Amino acid sequence: MASLSETLRSHWPIALFGVILFVAGGTELYWNEGRAVHNMMALDEAHADIYSVRFTEEEQEVGLEGRIVHLSGPILVGEPLTEPDYNIQLLAVKLRRRVQMYQWVEEAVEHNYGDSVGTTHSDSRTYYYTREWRDKIVDSRNFYNRHGHTNPSHFPIESHVQVADAVFIGRYELGAEVKEKFNNYQELTSDIRPEDSGVKLHLGIYYHTNDVFNPEVGDLRLLFSFAGMEGEVFSVVGKLSGNKLVPYITSRGVPVLLVYPGGLSVQEVFRLEARAQVLHTWWWRFVGWLLIFFGVTCNTKILRLLFVRVPLLVALAPDPQFPVTGNLLIAFSLALTIAAVAWILHRPVIGACLLLAGASPYVWFTRNLVDYHRLD
C-alpha cells in the first residue's frame, strides 16, 4: 500500500478539486441551514403578532398602522391593462407579452473517427440549418455557412410585462412587492381579431406574417398571458403602511410577505409557506450533500489511509473495491454535522437530533468494532 505522502503527490490535483467541492458543499449547507433557521423564526414572529382583517366598520377604529395583517378576498383592479394593437383589454394584476421570432438555427454534428472531439476538424462536422421560433436573437454571424442563413439583428417588438397601477383587496391597496408575487400566469385566448390586416390570429396566438402555416425568417408571433384576474380570491400577509400592504420586516431583518391564491385562513397561509420553505431547504440540502459526496469521493484513497491509522475510525474507511457505500455514509455524517452546527444555537433540540443522526454511522461501526475485539 502506498504511503500517505506518495498518495498526496500522485493524486494532488483530484484531491485539491475534492477539497474545493467539500468546502463549497459545507459552506452551502451552513448558509442554507442558517437561512432556514432565520426564515422559521421570522414566520414564528410574524404569526405571533398577526391580525386577520375582517373588513368591518369597527376595524377602522383599530390601530392597524405598522402591524402585520392577513387579508383574504377578491382582488380589484383600478384600470385595465391594454394591448391596443391586438384589441386586448383586461382587468388583471399582470399582462405578459411574449414575443418569438422565426429564425435560422445551426446544429453541428461531430463525426468522431478515433480522435477526441476537441481535435476534430471542421471538415469532419456536418452542419444542419433549420428554422424555429425562438425567444432570443440567434446570431447568424457565428454560423459556419452564413450564405442564405441570415437572421435579423433585433426584435421589432420586445417581450414585456405590464403591471396594474392600483390593485386592492377590500379598501387596502397592494404594494409593488405584493404585485410582483403574482406569477401564476394563465394563457390569454381571444376571438377578437386585430384591426391590422398584417396581424393574424390563430389558436390564440398573434402572428406578424403573411402565412401562418408557412412563416418566413423574421416573422413574429406573440403569446399573451395574465396573472391575477379581477375577482379572483387571494390571501395576503404583510404590513399595513398607510393604506398600502408592504413587506413586514421582523426584528432580525427578515422580510415576510406571503401571497397565495384562494380564501385561506391565517393558519393555512403559514402552513403552506412553511411547507414551501421545507421543500426549498431540502433541495439545497441535497445540493450541498452532493457536493460533499463528490468531494469525499475525490479523496477516497487519502481518507482510507488516514482512517486506517485510527483504530476507532478504521471501520469507516472506504473499501477500495466498493467505495461508494463508505463515501455515502461519510458524506451523510458530515452534512448532518454541519447542519447541526447551524441549528443548535437557535433550536437546540433540532440541532442535537441532527448531531446524533450525523454521529450514528460512527457509533454503529465503533460498537461493531468493539464487539469484534471482545470476541477475539
Curated annotation (Swiss-Prot):
Any one cellular-component term (Gene Ontology): nuclear inner membrane
Consequences of knocking out this gene: Viable, fertile and no developmental defects until 5 weeks of age.
The keyword Endoplasmic reticulum is annotated on this UniProt entry: yes
GO biological process: lipid metabolic process; nuclear membrane organization
Cytoplasmic side: 1-10, 299-323, 366-376
Cellular localisation: Endoplasmic reticulum membrane; Nucleus envelope
Primary subcellular site in the record, as a coarse category: endoplasmic reticulum
Keyword field: Endoplasmic reticulum, Membrane, Nucleus, Transmembrane, Transmembrane helix
Lumenal topology ranges: 32-277
Record InterPro entries: TMEM43_fam
Coiled coil: none
Entry function: Involved in lipid metabolism and utilization.
UniProt record similarity statement: Belongs to the TMEM43 family.
Name by which UniProt lists this protein: Transmembrane protein 43 homolog
Natural source organism: Drosophila melanogaster
Gene of this entry: Tmem43
